[in-house]
Swiss-Prot record:
Disulfide bonds: none
Keyword S-adenosyl-L-methionine: no
One GO CC annotation: membrane
Main location: membrane
Organism listed in the record: Homo sapiens
InterPro entries, sorted: DUF1075
Record keywords: Membrane, Transmembrane, Transmembrane helix
Protein name, entry field: Protein FAM162B
Similarity comment: Belongs to the UPF0389 family.
TM spans (from-to): 107-127
Region of interest called Disordered, as start-end residue ranges on this chain: 26-69
Length: 162
């Protein structure tokens, strides 16, 4: 990597050459600057980063270790069985606990919807069998509706002719 900074030409890490007008052409070795660690620091439940030490360039935003649950979150925590009553729920809860409870609630809601869908399928089957016993079908309904429309059109044509 070549970078021209003022009258210096930097050739990669630690190798600098003076390249200004009238400057002697010499290469000097400088120690490479310490680079900040790559990636985001991992936070433990205590709130301190695992690779704590002098931070490099810029600030690192801390992730809150606990948050106050909303009423909806409290209901989800109760519904998923994490707590037995509203009084047992602490004022501050780790976000992982809320996420886990929400995921369990999503799964329970999906199971409920699957069950309701199966019940609705059986209800449609039963109602269709009853309609067959009464000799009802969509074809007979459509034929009756079209016959009614023809009668109304014929009556309208007779009234118009008079």
């Amino acid at each position: 990597m070549l970078r021209a900074v003022g009258s210096l030409l930097r050739l990669g890490r630690g190798l600098t050459v003076r390249c200004g007008p009238g400057a002697p052409l010499e290469a000097t070795r400088r120690p490479a600057p310490a680079l900040p660690p790559r990636g985001l620091p991992c936070y433990s439940s205590g709130g301190a980063p695992s690779n704590s030490g002098p931070q490099g360039h810029g600030e690192i935003h801390r992730v809150p270790t606990q948050r106050r649950p909303s009423q909806f979150d409290k209901k989800i925590l109760l519904w998923t069985g994490r707590f037995k009553s509203m009084e047992e729920i602490p004022p501050r809860i780790p976000p992982e606990m809320i996420d886990t409870a929400r995921n369990k609630a999503r799964v329970k809601a999906c199971y409920i919807m699957i069950g309701l869908t199966i019940i609705a399928c059986f209800a449609v089957i039963v109602s269709a069998k009853r309609a067959v016993e009464r000799h009802e079908s969509l074809t007979s309904w459509n034929l009756a509706k079209k016959a009614k429309w023809r009668e109304e059109a014929a009556l309208a044509a007779q009234a118009k002719a008079k």
